[in-house]
Amino acid sequence: MLADLPIALNPHEPTSIPTQLTEQIRRLVARGILTPGDPLPSSRSLSTQLGVSRGSVVTAYDQLAGEGYLSTARGSGTTINPDLHLLKPVEIEKKETSRSVPPPLLNLSPGVPDTATLADSAWRAAWREACAKPPTHSPEQGLLRLRIEIADHLRQMRGLMVEPEQIIVTAGAREGLSLLLRTMDAPARIGVESPGYPSLRRIPQVLGHETIDVPTDESGLVPRALPHDLNALLVTPSHQYPYGGSLPADRRTALVAWAEANDALLIEDDFDSELRYVGMPLPPLRALAPDRTILLGTFSSVITPQVACGYLIAPTPQARVLATLRGILGQPVGAITQHALASYLASGALRRRTQRLRRLYRHRRSIVQDTLGDLPNTQLRPINGGLHAVLLCDKPQDLVVTTLASRGLNVTALSHYWGGTGADNGIVFGFGSHDEDTLRWVLAEISDAVSLG
């Protein structure tokens, strides 16, 4: 057995940790570094070596065993399948390079949470239970136990009453939106906020729908400016992206009235709703119009995006249509992951974790405000919730982004979030995933980069 498998995982890639691990073990086999009969580390040992959850390793091992790469036997551990037929190992040509590869940038992507304290006893216990008693079947809508726990979680955390049969388990907001849009006749006219989340803007276009930019201000969507010929409207009422406005009650009422008058579907992205630092969050839009609203939810901000699990809530008739389509396309979230999340939710650990994260992020938010709040020639937009900040500046945003990249920091130009012209000048950066010392260093670099001096 190799003392340490030559594997390097990147938690900030869009590909999940189990998928990265699966691909890299396949590659080691293809290159002849791992050969038939070679023993592999136990899931516990490899998870410790790589600094990932044991559940991620178990999921990867299960996938590889199903593909015939691995063999597992009680008492003898996990090995590369002795009967695996291999092609000649691929020799990878080593090319000389005239310059060194630049080091990876420190990830300041918006929405990345702090996972340093995630792997506590409740999290480990949930994955142990899921791996010890893996489900044998996952319904199209997702495990009933998980849907029951999601319904209870929403009742306690968001004051929302839903039934398990109205819930579809998804691989996150983007996947849930994609599933929903596949049930709509193309080309539908889909209203999207401008500025808004770029990938949620692109998904309708990829599926053959037309996107129509709708304006926002410091409070979010502006209902009076909505056109009357939209089939659906994608809206973030709890935490508008990226500016963070929360849609006030009068606008919510006006939005529901607009939807009813125009027979339009409201697609509510409940992004960052549980991470609010000022006042109490308003109930979801779905509470006002349950028969006209589809709610997209995810656990990425309070657990980790690498879990790749979320939910979609629809009126019962539409939920049946979505479940039928899900049965055709397949359930993208593994049953073991669903079982582990159900156990984690049932233990109450996620509610306790969310409370701890609010305190942690509120402190980091204060550091951002204290450092950047009074910088000359800039304006720090209010941070009422979420894991990112928006800093308007007089210095050209592309120059700021380039300067910070040269110092090993990746921030996003504010214009990235606009569908067309009229973008404000500034940057967007996440502050949730790094410790206090790192955050203070990052903010000092940002302060210097936006300076006109």
Swiss-Prot record:
Gene3D superfamilies: Type I PLP-dependent aspartate aminotransferase-like (Major domain) (3.40.640.10), Winged helix-like DNA-binding domain superfamily/Winged helix DNA-binding domain (1.10.10.10). Residues 15-83 form the HTH gntR-type domain. The keyword Transcription applies. Coiled coil: none annotated. Its cofactor is pyridoxal 5'-phosphate. SUPFAM superfamilies: PLP-dependent transferases, Winged helix' DNA-binding domain. It comes from the Bacteria. In the C-terminal section; belongs to the class-I pyridoxal-phosphate-dependent aminotransferase family. Pfam families: GntR (PF00392). It comes from Corynebacterium glutamicum (strain ATCC 13032 / DSM 20300 / JCM 1318 / BCRC 11384 / CCUG 27702 / LMG 3730 / NBRC 12168 / NCIMB 10025 / NRRL B-2784 / 534). The keyword rRNA-binding does not apply. InterPro entries: HTH_trans_reg/aminotransferase, PyrdxlP-dep_Trfase, PyrdxlP-dep_Trfase_major, Tscrpt_reg_HTH_GntR, WH-like_DNA-bd_sf, WH_DNA-bd_sf. The lineage of its organism: Bacteria, Bacillati, Actinomycetota, Actinomycetes, Mycobacteriales. This is HTH-type pyridoxine biosynthesis transcriptional regulator PdxR. Keywords: Aminotransferase, DNA-binding, Pyridoxal phosphate, Transcription, Transcription regulation, Transferase. May have a regulatory function in pyridoxine biosynthesis. Is said to also have an aminotransferase activity in valine biosynthesis as a double inactivation of ilvE and pdxR results in an auxotrophic requirement for valine. GO terms for molecular function: DNA binding; DNA-binding transcription factor activity; transaminase activity. Residues 43-62 bind DNA.
